[in-house]
Amino acid sequence: MPWPSRKRDKGAVADKKEPDAKIAKTEEETEDKEEEEKSTKPPAGSSKSGLKNWKKAKESDSGGEESKITYCHWLLKSEPESRLEKGVDVKFSIEDLKAQPNQTTFWEGVRNYQARNFLRAMKLGQQAFFYHSNCKEPGIVGIVKIVKEAYPDHTQFDQKDPHYDSSSRKENPKWSMVDVQFVRMTKRFIPLSEIKTHHLAHKADGGPLKNMMLFSRQRLSIQPLTQEEFDFVLSLEEEKPH
């Protein structure tokens, strides 16, 4: 099936209403480079125990440890407003998804190791929140489902694509993507600010959102959700906006 050209973030993005989470692109690239080096080279002068720990960390980076965890639901961030990256507009809103053939598309362009591992852990039929990010009012706008589990992201091999990775090889691809299909819009827009209010209350007094990754790992564009987190956030669509 032919797909129109559209791109998302690199897998790590901060929302405009969370300035403390913003990290310069060069710093983000440095972090990913350091993470890659850690996954391929053992520390110099490692003891036997140190080498053993490094091997465990390497398994985790390659998806070994995290991908074994069964998550029920997900949160996928995408940018609804135009932004050029290497001359290509990376805008992709939920309306863009609805306009795709069969309201289905591949979720490509993730270039963060932890986000990639979460993609690889996704199972057929699991649902995810579609989250508008890096915009004036970030938040949840709809629900999608996984219709194809992780497979190699073709954009890593396309030199004209902003997410091209010259270090990736077709015989051992670094990056993966999944296919997602539109399920429905949420009954109302659920803003980040409202979710954060509940997160802070639950963090203080206990509740399903106390450990929500949306606030502990703000930069990740692919995030897991527990059943309790998903159910609570979804219940907010029934309430009047604060």
Curated annotation (Swiss-Prot):
Q: Which GO terms describe its cellular component?
A: nucleus
Motif placement: Nuclear localization signal? 6-10
Matching entries from InterPro entries are given as: 5hmC_binding, EVE_domain, PUA-like_sf, THYN1-like_EVE
Residue numbers spanned by region Disordered:
1-64
Q: Identify the domain of life.
A: Eukaryota
Biased region (Acidic residues) positions are 28-37
What Pfam family is a match for this entry?
EVE
Renumbered to this chain, the Basic and acidic residues biased-composition regions fall at: 10-27
Q: Where in the cell is it found?
A: Nucleus
Please tell me in which tissues this protein is expressed. Answer: Expressed at high levels in bursa of fabricus, thymus and spleen. Also found in the liver, intestine, heart and brain.
Keyword annotations of the record: Nucleus, Phosphoprotein
Q: Does the keyword Phosphoprotein apply?
A: yes
Q: How is it modified after translation?
A: Undergoes proteolytic processing during lymphocyte apoptosis.
Relate the protein's function as given in its record: Specifically binds 5-hydroxymethylcytosine (5hmC), suggesting that it acts as a specific reader of 5hmC.
Q: Which PANTHER family match?
A: THYMOCYTE NUCLEAR PROTEIN 1 (PTHR14087:SF7)
The name on file for this protein is Thymocyte nuclear protein 1
Gene that this sequence comes from: THYN1
